[in-house]
Amino acid sequence: MKYYSFSSTFNAQKKQEKIDLLLNTNQYIYSLKTDGNWSRMIWQDGEMILQSRTVSKKTGTYGEFQDKVLFADALREAFHDTTMLIGEIYLEDGRDKDVGTILRCLPDKALSRQKGDKILKYRIFDCWYYNGVSLLEAPITERIKYLPLAAKAINSELVN
């Protein structure tokens, strides 16, 4: 899957030209960008994991965050067949580095740091599998139809 953002070499004029081109073709979908940590939620074989984007150089495995978020119980109960959601773990009005500061902690410390306005949330922006159905070959216009269903199944005010 490819998600697009402007190259850092684009100046304001070049960005506007690209936006105008996309608007004139009607070949675009947009969504709110949240500054957090990209991650995937995976339900498979009766288990649920919330994984990082990259493999750790230290452990050689993907980071797992499901024990570091307050919405973990809602995640565990949401699906019983293969489902994979792509999204961003974020802090309301926070930045990526602030999210990372919490997620790099051990689970107990990560949970204790989430107080007041420092509570980690999750924004779903894509769905690759839903209840055993692969959506990998489906266009984004079809996959995004599953986002409200997924958020409803998770049933947590911290996930949208």
Protein language model features and the residues they cover:
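Short, surface-exposed recognition loops or helix-turn segments adjacent to catalytic cores
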Residues: S156-N160
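Charged, flexible boundary elements
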Residues: M1-N24, Y30
